């Protein structure tokens, strides 16, 4: 029915019929109450069906009426010649077109952000699993992390392994390890595990096991992490014995230790002791009793390995070991340096090159300091002075071909292309 008046008349007619039908239903109910035979019961059923049918019809007609009224309003609505939406506060039209409406109903501002993760709850959850499934999940989220995240983005995935199970009434049931792979719009719970949080907590709990299995994230591999940690114990001991430029030189030879990096680190450890947070101390206690391989000195053989899988902040279990948070910052600077080198040598406009740069250091600094500790920039400078040049010389820059070999190969390519076409040969 296209006519508004026809629909209104139809509703009026059906409402009159409904009044009569309801009266007949009441009469039928009274009759059944006095004489409940089969005929009267059948009549009652028919009366009820008639009332239901009329109510449904009236409901449908009212919906039609509402649609017609809405369509009529839309048709008569005056179009703003300026192209500005009615509720837009601008007096003149913006140069930008109107885009999508972003629904924020699902966002809860009371939920903590990713920077205030409940590390104790996350650590306790990870420690409840056997080591094989944890290390296999770490491999999937570090060595094969990009592929795993790409295939499962926006979902909550479960890792399953035969080594991880629980007995329920005598039946062996798989115990899944849950990890959330959020999108940019996702809001994470304090105890929800994301790939970044997972790498952070597992690297902090099991550095010795990661070292034994040589699990290294690609972003750490390309900055030469394997070479860097090859002789880590000798490297860090030589570093701690070296003279510190930030300490005054001793007057006597017997006091030479007081001007070394080791002495600076001892002073730093005293400062760190004053910054401890109870939740992280509780996590460390839980981890020590749960079989984790923790350390309390940067000279430990596995201390550098807590960064092997590129955690996005210093793992909380090593947060209070002097020099360790700064070591992670040093690695993040190396990642930025390598990306800057790669962007510089690439072909493209200045703007395109800038897009290839990264900000790992800023992200690491912000996330680590949000855990309640300020990084000592002087320690990062010491690392850069002592190890920076060596680290840069071992970057993987995607150019492992010998220059002479490249020249010979390019000459052969140039010759062959000129033989078969008049196009300009590409560079290898």
Swiss-Prot record:
InterPro entries tied to this protein: Hanta_nucleocap (IPR002214)
Region Interaction with host RPS19, annotated ranges: 150-175
Location in the cell: Virion; Host cytoplasm, Host perinuclear region; Host Golgi apparatus, Host cis-Golgi network
Region span, Homomultimerization: 1-79, 100-125, 372-420
Chain spans, region Interaction with host DAXX: 372-428
Region (RdRP binding): 1-50
Keyword terms: Chaperone, Coiled coil, Endonuclease, Host cytoplasm, Host Golgi apparatus, Hydrolase, Nuclease, Ribonucleoprotein, RNA-binding, Viral nucleoprotein, Virion
EC number(s) on file: 3.1.-.-
Region Interaction with glycoprotein N, annotated ranges: 80-248
Region (Viral RNA-binding): 175-217
Region annotation (Chaperone activity) ranges: 1-100
Record carries keyword Cell inner membrane: no
Assigned protein family: Belongs to the hantavirus nucleocapsid protein family.
Full protein name: Nucleoprotein
Lineage: Viruses, Riboviria, Orthornavirae, Negarnaviricota, Polyploviricotina
């Amino acid at each position: 029915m296209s006519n508004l008046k026809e629909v209104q008349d139809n509703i009026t007619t059906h409402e009159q019929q409904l009044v009569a039908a309801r009266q007949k239903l009441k009469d039928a109910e009274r009759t059944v109450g006095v004489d409940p035979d089969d005929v009267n019961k059948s009549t009652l059923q028919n009366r009820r069906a008639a009332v239901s049918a009329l109510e449904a019809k009236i409901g449908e007609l009212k919906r039609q009426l509402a649609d017609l009224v809405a369509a009529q309003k839309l048709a008569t609505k005056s179009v703003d010649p300026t192209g500005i939406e009615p509720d837009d506060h601008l007096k003149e039209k913006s140069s930008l077109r109107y885009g999508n409406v972003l629904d924020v109903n699902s966002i809860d501002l009371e939920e903590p952000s990713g920077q205030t993760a409940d590390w104790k709850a996350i650590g306790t959850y990870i420690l409840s699993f056997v080591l094989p499934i944890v290390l296999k999940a770490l491999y999937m989220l570090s060595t094969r992390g990009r592929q795993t995240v790409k295939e499962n983005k926006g979902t909550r995935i479960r890792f399953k392994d035969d080594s991880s199970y629980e007995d329920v009434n005598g039946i062996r049931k798989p115990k899944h390890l849950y990890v959330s792979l959020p999108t940019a719009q996702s809001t994470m719970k304090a105890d929800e595990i994301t790939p970044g949080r997972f790498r952070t907590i597992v690297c902090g709990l099991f550095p010795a096991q990661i070292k034994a299995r040589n699990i290294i994230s690609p972003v750490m591999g390309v900055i030469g992490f394997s070479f860097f940690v090859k002789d880590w114990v000798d490297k860090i001991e030589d570093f701690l014995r070296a003279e510190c430029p930030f300490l005054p030189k001793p007057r006597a030879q017997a006091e030479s230790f007081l001007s070394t990096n080791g002495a600076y680190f001892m002073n730093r450890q005293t400062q760190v002791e004053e910054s401890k947070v109870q939740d992280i101390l509780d996590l460390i206690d839980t981890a020590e009793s749960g079989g984790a391989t923790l350390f309390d000195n940067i000279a430990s053989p596995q201390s550098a390995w807590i960064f092997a899988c590129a955690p996005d902040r210093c793992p909380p279990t090593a947060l209070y070991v002097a020099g360790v948070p700064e070591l992670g910052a040093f690695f993040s600077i190396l990642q930025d340096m390598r990306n800057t080198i790669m962007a510089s040598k690439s072909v493209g406009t200045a703007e395109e090159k800038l897009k290839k740069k990264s900000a790992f250091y800023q992200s690491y600094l912000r996330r680590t300091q949000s855990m309640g500790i300020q990084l000592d920039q002087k320690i990062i400078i010491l690392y850069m002075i002592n190890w920076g040049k060596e680290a840069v010389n071992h970057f993987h820059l995607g150019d492992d071909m010998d220059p002479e070999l490249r020249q010979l190969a390019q000459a052969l390519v140039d010759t062959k292309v000129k033989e078969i076409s008049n196009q300009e040969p590409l560079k290898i």
